[in-house]
Regions:
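Short, conserved, surface-exposed binding loops centered on an aromatic residue
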Residues: 66-70, 96-98, 120-124, 152
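Alpha-helical, coiled-coil/dimerization segments enriched in small aliphatic residues
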Residues: 86-114, 118
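Long, aromatic- and glycine/proline-rich binding clefts that accommodate carbohydrate-like moieties
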Residues: 147-166
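Acidic/His-rich segments in extracytoplasmic proteins that coordinate ligands and/or metal ions
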Residues: 1-42, 46, 113-153
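Active-site phosphate/pyrophosphate- and oxyanion-stabilizing loops and adjacent acidic/basic residues
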Residues: 37, 94-95, 120, 182
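Extracytoplasmic substrate-binding proteins
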Residues: 9-85, 106-107, 162-202
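Short helix-capping and hinge/turn segments at secondary-structure transitions, especially at repeat
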Residues: 61, 98-105, 127-135
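Short, well-ordered secondary-structure micro-motifs
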Residues: 86-89, 141-143, 173
Length: 202
């Protein structure tokens, strides 16, 4: 059984039930690689794990080169349930924003999970872009038409997008999450990271 490290208090109970438990904390790139290595060792697939890490590393290195020297716009990454939820620096989504050469508008948030914020706070941050989570229960139009956000730069410029979700949530700490970084970079830096670039990476 694989559980997030934040649920470590429940591990002894699971082990008492005869379960083998692996705890992971993939909330940044190093943590994600650590989780891949742990699972590869546990499943005796170390070589495949190394190949996967190398592929992710290669894609992220190419992305970093593509966006090098560009300005880093501010990004508000909205959560699954509401536009009034966001990811702070303790979450993997922050790494994804940084990989795309963006700046997390919610960098001051201290929560280690999705943080609830107010409309006033979003307007105070005034992000250049609002990005909806892959599995958001609302859509881009609902944000663009939200009167409470009418004065936000991202809304005025119609810089509101949703991360892809055709196969899995690429804004989650999973191996395919590098595609979330590439997609986000294609939104923030379309001249450097074209739609063709994104589809080639995918």
């Amino acid at each position: 059984v694989i559980v997030p490290a934040k649920l470590k208090d429940s591990i002894p109970q699971m082990e008492e039930m005869g379960l083998t438990v692996l705890a992971v904390k993939p909330e940044n790139q190093a943590g994600l690689f650590g989780a891949i290595e742990l699972l590869a060792q546990a499943t005796n697939t170390t070589a495949r794990g190394e190949e996967l890490e190398m592929a992710i590393d290669s894609n992220l290195a190419a992305l970093a080169e593509a966006v090098a020297g560009t300005d880093a716009p501010s990004v508000y990454l909205a959560g699954n349930s509401s536009v009034l939820e966001t990811a702070g620096p303790a979450m993997y989504q922050n790494t994804m924003i940084e990989n795309a050469n963006g700046t997390n508008a919610a960098a001051s948030v201290e929560d280690t999970y999705w943080a609830e914020v107010s409309y006033e706070q979003i307007l105070d941050w005034n992000p250049d872009y609002i990005i909806l989570a892959s599995d958001a229960e609302y859509d881009v139009d609902s944000v663009l038409n939200d009167a409470a956000l009418a004065d936000c730069t991202a809304v005025k410029e119609r810089h509101v997008y949703q991360l892809p979700h055709a196969v899995e949530a690429v804004d989650s700490p999973v191996p395919a999450s590098f595609l979330g970084s590439v997609y986000l970079a294609s939104v923030l830096h379309p001249e450097q990271v074209t739609e063709e670039y994104y589809h080639a990476a995918a």
